């Protein structure tokens, strides 16, 4: 009953990333049918349990949307391969990081290294021994950078375990993907994620048709959720925000 793949929506143009994503693990499993045939990173309730297999399998495949690619610092040419671009965007969140995936029988081990001064590099570190947010954000980067135009991605709590600057960088990637034809639906409790979308609108990375924000609160009498569609100006301001909408600092 927890397998969602039987629904037509779950195809190679769709990914669902739940708040209950896999964090750092000792090893990650393989599912060739899921990853190769269906191009999915999750099998059970959006847990992204096959994201590392996906990244390993498609690591040398160029990303579908070239304009999402960024350069390695100091290089003139862009490496469009998926692993390279995931690593480069991850470096914007966690500087100097390098990704290493080892095949162990039918499983995979995820490790990281970090560039240091004087062209030296640290020893390999297990994902278990690095910051939780590094591994937690990987499925988001993988999903967006492997997405085709007109794909749909649902992401719960993209801010989880990521510091505010990292959230802003993540929203930069999300906004760029949206502007290039990827539909991304986010559930968030972070003002940095909200503000990132508004900044993207103000800076004309996205246009007003690309952004809609809904706020949900609870009707205390009926004990049901009530949604509010927020009015957003072209300059990235929310007009007349409802009571309770990130107003704790007022």
Indicate residue ranges for each PLM-predicted region.
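RecA-like P-loop NTPase motor core
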Residues: 77, 92, 96, 100, ...
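Conserved D-loop beta-strand region of ABC ATPase nucleotide-binding domains
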Residues: 187
